């Protein structure tokens, strides 16, 4: 998993609340169990005018040329609600997004994102609105998300602080998923196992 320390990137926004996981990655695309290849289906029902995904919707934000290559997504409250599917952060990450900034997230989506290297940043509704206004008013507007300082820097230079559980921050800073986190304690695990009495093995 790629470590997340500080990232500066083009920002794009979907100014909607309660974006659920079926909107993020519709159920018909969930048959794969590997993490790659989901980006093309991200927001499928909004991005395309046809079921096959051959006709882009020119009015959808992510299809606008000015947002091509965006790596930071701004959204409204309760992002990632709905059914539990790890494919949602897989699709967002495979599309090229590194961070999602919103006033709130659904709990399961929030945890799944952290476990898959996607940083969910909670800011106040007013702070998210300011970021959206700045991004809308300036083509090519970039936002910096610094996990080392837990700050978001807007295109105009305004700084907003956010919080993240230290365990989650440690995993993201070091690029550790659940398996990687376990392996990072390999020495301690080995010492523990070496001291287990033979009759308990």
UniProtKB/Swiss-Prot annotation:
Q: Which Pfam families match?
A: Aconitase_C (PF00694)
EC number of the protein: 4.2.1.33
Q: Does the keyword Amino-acid biosynthesis apply?
A: yes
Subunit and partners: Heterodimer of LeuC and LeuD.
Q: Which GO terms describe its biological process?
A: L-leucine biosynthetic process
Q: Which UniProt keywords apply?
A: Amino-acid biosynthesis, Branched-chain amino acid biosynthesis, Leucine biosynthesis, Lyase
What family does the database annotate? Belongs to the LeuD family. LeuD type 1 subfamily.
Q: What class of enzyme is it?
A: lyase
Function of the molecule: Catalyzes the isomerization between 2-isopropylmalate and 3-isopropylmalate, via the formation of 2-isopropylmaleate.
Q: What is this protein called?
A: 3-isopropylmalate dehydratase small subunit
Q: Which InterPro entries has this protein been placed in?
A: 3-IsopropMal_deHydase_ssu, Aconitase/3IPM_dehydase_swvl, AconitaseA/IPMdHydase_ssu_swvl, IPMI_Swivel, LeuD
Q: Name one GO molecular function term.
A: 3-isopropylmalate dehydratase activity
> What organism does this protein naturally occur in?
Shewanella sp. (strain MR-4)
Per UniProt, what is the name of the gene that codes for the protein in this document?
A: leuD
Per its record, the protein catalyses: (2R,3S)-3-isopropylmalate = (2S)-2-isopropylmalate
**Pathway linked to the protein:** Amino-acid biosynthesis; L-leucine biosynthesis; L-leucine from 3-methyl-2-oxobutanoate: step 2/4
Entry GO terms, CC = 3-isopropylmalate dehydratase complex
Recorded hits in NCBIfam families, A to Z, give: leuD (TIGR00171), PRK01641.1 (NF002458)
Q: Which PANTHER family match?
A: 3-ISOPROPYLMALATE DEHYDRATASE SMALL SUBUNIT, 3-ISOPROPYLMALATE DEHYDRATASE SMALL SUBUNIT 2-RELATED-RELATED
Q: Could you tell me which HAMAP family the record lists for this protein?
A: LeuD_type1
């Amino acid at each position: 998993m790629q470590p997340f320390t500080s990232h500066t990137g083009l920002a794009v926004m979907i100014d909607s609340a309660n974006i659920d996981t079926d909107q993020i990655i519709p159920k018909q695309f969930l048959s794969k169990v590997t993490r790659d290849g989901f980006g093309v289906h991200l927001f499928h029902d909004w991005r395309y005018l046809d079921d096959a995904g051959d006709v882009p919707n020119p009015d959808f934000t992510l299809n606008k040329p000015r947002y091509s290559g965006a790596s930071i997504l701004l959204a409204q409250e309760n992002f990632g609600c709905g059914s539990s599917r790890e494919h949602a952060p897989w699709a967002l990450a495979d599309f090229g997004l590194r961070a999602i900034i919103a006033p709130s997230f659904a709990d399961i989506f929030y945890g799944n994102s952290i476990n898959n290297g996607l940083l969910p940043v909670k800011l106040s509704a007013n702070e998210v609105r300011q970021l959206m206004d700045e991004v809308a008013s300036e083509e090519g507007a970039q936002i910096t998300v610094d996990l080392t300082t837990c700050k978001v820097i807007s295109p105009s230079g305004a700084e907003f602080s956010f919080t993240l559980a230290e365990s989650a921050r440690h995993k993201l800073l070091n690029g550790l998923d659940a398996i990687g986190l376990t392996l990072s304690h390999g020495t301690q695990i080995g010492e523990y196992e070496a001291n287990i009495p033979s009759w308990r093995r």
